[in-house]
Design a protein with these regions (language model features):
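Short amphipathic alpha-helical coupling segments at ligand-binding clamshell hinges
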Residues: 143-153
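A bilobed periplasmic-binding-protein/Venus flytrap-type ligand-binding module shared by bacterial periplasmic
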Residues: 128-143, 162
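Conserved small-residue motifs centered on glycine
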Residues: 149, 157-222
């Protein structure tokens, strides 16, 4: 069946990609042809989505208890070969799909374009803003430059290729959490995941990390 958890819009085993196939965009404000905005959860296309999900549920393709299963519980079924398809985000390949492959080396997961409904020839997936948070400094702050200094220090410790201290601060291994999580500030390049995917593609084929460093080396080793 299709993996699904009770967080229907949470990126992991959710229904957003399924809804996009019907031209529905739950929790998005969608611009209409006349320039007005409509809330995506209230459109006729969303009603079609729910009807299709109800049909899957009634025919046994969805776990009867998905509404009480969080992501971790739903992932257990996937890892134990009880699911054959899921909608998810980029990190899904790292977890839980990798756990399933570790347990069942014959598992064969592949990415596909979002399947379209009969009424839709192509799908535009709903995506979030690349910038998800901002920092602001009060005009009454005695040392406003401290924010920039903190950000510079964060970049130096996590990203500097000469220091190459990413593993120490971000991914020490052995089940330990990286101390970067303790930082009061953080930032990332908006396209870092795309750049990492391109950078490690060839090394994964050859088995030679070459000059990879930092997060890209960590992803290669993972």
């Amino acid at each position: 069946g299709m993996a699904l958890c009770n967080d229907l819009y949470g990126n992991l085993m959710d229904i957003k990609g399924f809804a996009n196939a019907y031209g529905a965009y739950p929790r998005y404000w969608v611009q209409q042809d006349d320039g007005t905005l409509v809330y995506g959860s209230t459109t006729p296309e969303m009603k079609q989505t729910l009807e299709a999900l109800a049909d899957l549920y009634q025919n046994g393709y969805l776990d009867e208890e998905f509404h009480v299963n969080d992501g971790t519980k739903a992932a257990e079924d996937l890892v134990n070969d009880k699911c054959g398809v899921l909608y998810g985000w980029h990190a899904t390949a790292l977890w839980p799909l990798q756990d399933n492959l570790n347990q069942n080396p014959d598992a064969d997961w592949r990415p596909y374009q979002i399947v379209t409904s009969e009424e839709s020839a192509e799908v535009t997936p709903g995506i979030n803003m690349m910038t998800s948070s901002w920092y602001a400094v009060s005009s009454e702050c005695e040392h406003p430059e401290a924010l920039v200094e903190l950000l510079n220090l964060y970049c130096e410790k996590v990203f500097d290729p000469e220091l190459n201290e990413y593993s120490y601060y971000a991914n020490p291994g052995d089940g330990l959490e990286g101390v970067w999580r303790l930082s009061p500030v953080s930032l990332n390049s908006p396209d870092k995941n795309q750049q990492t995917a391109k950078a490690i593609a060839e090394p994964l084929k050859t088995g030679d990390p070459g000059d990879l460093y930092g997060e890209q080396l960590s992803m290669y080793e993972y």
